[in-house]
A protein has these predicted regions:
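Conserved catalytic core of the tyrosine transesterase superfamily
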Residues: 1-225
């Protein structure tokens, strides 16, 4: 029973049920079991002996409407174009924070609609597909917004700051927090929240765990699960 609860989606906030919610379920069922025993009606066996540490809590995720709300607060300025690329890279392509920050122009394979992640976890590289929306946003940013931010400077990195330098990973995180606030999204979590969200949405859409594993760059299927 608790295996079911630990994997049940949170209908209101996305992700899984919180530890406190699971604990409340456990306490209520324990009290009900004691009532049955006091009335000599038997015992309810639902795995009440399971410890909190044994209950797997799913990561929090954004809903699809949350993602669209993020897009809606972005304008057509150079920084707005960069915002769309931020969302496309971390949600649309499911990259880790360090992977997205390390992307360079040479890592965008336009003819194949792929990103080359050369600095993945544990030094592993991989190719990640870009859907049409992400490819269009990246192309527009590279041809327009990025050039405006750069001025006469030369930088190899994809993400450029408003001063024309390489945008720091902390700045990417801070900007995502600002976008969430503008969109009225209260969910906590940084850029990894977008990675969890796309993985969950792919699963809900019928994508196999094996494909999602390769998409995310996980070494084992257990990590994806």
């Amino acid at each position: 029973f608790f295996e079911y609860l630990s994997n049940r989606p949170n209908q209101r906030f996305g992700g899984g049920l919180s530890e406190s919610t699971l604990r409340n379920y456990r306490m209520s069922l324990r009290r009900f079991t004691r009532y049955l025993e006091s009335k000599e009606l038997g015992c309810l066996d639902v795995g009440l002996s399971m410890r909190s540490s044994e209950v797997r809590v799913l990561p929090q995720v954004l809903s699809r409407s949350d993602i669209e709300s993020l897009y809606e607060v972005m304008d057509d300025s150079a920084l707005g174009q960069r915002d769309r690329v931020l969302l496309g890279i971390y949600y649309g392509c499911g990259l880790r924070k360090s992977e997205g920050w390390a992307l360079e122009l040479r890592d965008v394979l336009w003819d194949k609609s792929l990103l080359y992640v050369r600095k993945g976890k544990r030094g592993k590289s991989r190719y990640v597909p870009m859907v049409d929306r992400v490819r269009r946003d990246v192309l527009r940013y590279v041809q327009d917004g990025r050039r405006e931010l750069l001025g006469k400077e030369f930088r190899s990195g994809l993400f450029i700051s408003s001063q024309g330098g390489q945008l720091s990973s902390q700045s990417l995180y801070d900007r995502f927090k600002q976008l969430k606030k503008l969109a009225g999204i209260e969910s906590s979590g940084g850029l990894h929240l977008l990675r969890h969200s796309i993985a969950t949405h792919l699963l809900w859409g019928g994508m196999s765990l094996e494909y999602i594993r390769r998409f995310l760059g996980h070494s084992t299927l257990e990590t994806t699960q």
